[in-house]
């Protein structure tokens, strides 16, 4: 007797390897429970692979954008640019680590649900596995806007610092010119008195 409220959803095709692992770990499970569990693991693997690929593409895009935007500032002020690029790389690493922590949390949640499956009814277990799979498939882990915002902030800071340095150099140049004029006037006045 099955619960009529549990709706049938299409099961993601699981690899033979994944199915065999699930069968080994759950020898007394029904074929449907094994298929749903294997589908959950496939969804997790699919999502993790997509996130790794997206993170790689996003990291490459962010890096190229940062290099293009900051190329002028890098030539003019290499030390400042090096510090800013290091900060961007650090931010990207932190975002990647956060994404892996989310994937690990999803995996842990799925494993906990598999362990609890022996204690709950077959229908409740299948429902929990389907919900976990849906959560994995709908979860967005990469925050593209935050990485682009960090790159833009780095560019703004580099330009602002460069303008401050240029103003200071211009001010020094003006003071040196004024000092040279004053020295020349004093020197010519001294020689004019002697003649």
Task: Map each language-model feature to its residues.
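N-terminal acidic, proline/glycine-rich, low-complexity intrinsically disordered segments
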Residues: 1-11
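Amphipathic alpha-helical membrane/lipid-surface binding segments
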Residues: 15-195
